[in-house]
Regions:
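Glycine-rich phosphate/diphosphate-binding loop of Rossmann-like nucleotide-binding domains
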Residues: 1-56
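A broad, structural surface signal
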Residues: 3, 47-50, 66, 70, ...
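Short acidic, glycine/serine/threonine-rich loops at helix termini
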Residues: 3, 14, 20-25, 67-69, ...
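Structural motif
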Residues: 8-10, 53-56, 75-78, 97-100, ...
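Long hydrophobic segments that form regular secondary structure
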Residues: 41-94, 128
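Adenosine-phosphate binding glycine-rich loop
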Residues: 81-169
């Protein structure tokens, strides 16, 4: 997200917002702290969600409440913990989320790595790439995003289904 030009990306761990200079950061957190949380915010996840445009969760069930979502800026919520997301779609929508996606196939907007891996690997193998670059990942994200025609975009239909026959396999 940072490499694609998104603004102030704030990351959290079990203790809350990760901030440059915090004690106890592991090497990966230390590295990411230098390029994220540009306003040096501190606090818990609830603080990070205030006025946020989006939440991307890959952590644990029932971490986010509809009250937390209600503090977001017309938020986009991707709650991808499986099998139980950080917040259930109906709760996120009740909190005011504009768009909700989960990792589950029984809800709209399934966000699943199966959309990416076959095509990225096929492309990398076809050009004998020695690594998957940021540019390759960005182009894959744009290609997947473009699979839903503008006239078909709705809050419940923002991403192609893993069963879409147009996906490279």
């Amino acid at each position: 997200l940072i490499n694609m030009g998104f603004g102030n990306v704030i990351m959290c761990d079990i203790n809350g917002i990760i901030c440059e200079g915090d004690e106890g950061l592991n090497p990966g957190q230390e590295e990411i702290s230098h390029i994220s949380n540009l306003n040096h915010e501190h606090g818990k996840l609830a603080d990070a969600l205030k006025d946020a445009d989006a939440f991307i969760g890959v952590s644990r069930p029932n971490l986010v409440t509809k009250e937390m979502v209600s503090t977001m800026n017309n938020g986009i919520v991707f709650a991808m913990a499986n099998p139980t997301p950080e917040i259930m779609p109906d709760e996120a929508l009740a909190g005011g989320a504009a768009v909700v996606g989960t990792g589950r196939s029984d809800f709209p907007n399934q966000i699943n790595n199966v959309l990416v891996f076959p095509g990225v690997f096929k492309g990398a193998l076809s050009v004998r790439a020695k690594e998957i670059t940021e540019l390759m990942k960005q182009r894959a994200s744009y290609a997947i995003a473009s699979m839903i025609p503008d006239e078909e975009l709705t809050p419940e239909n923002i991403i192609a289904s893993p069963l879409n026959k147009a996906l490279p396999m």
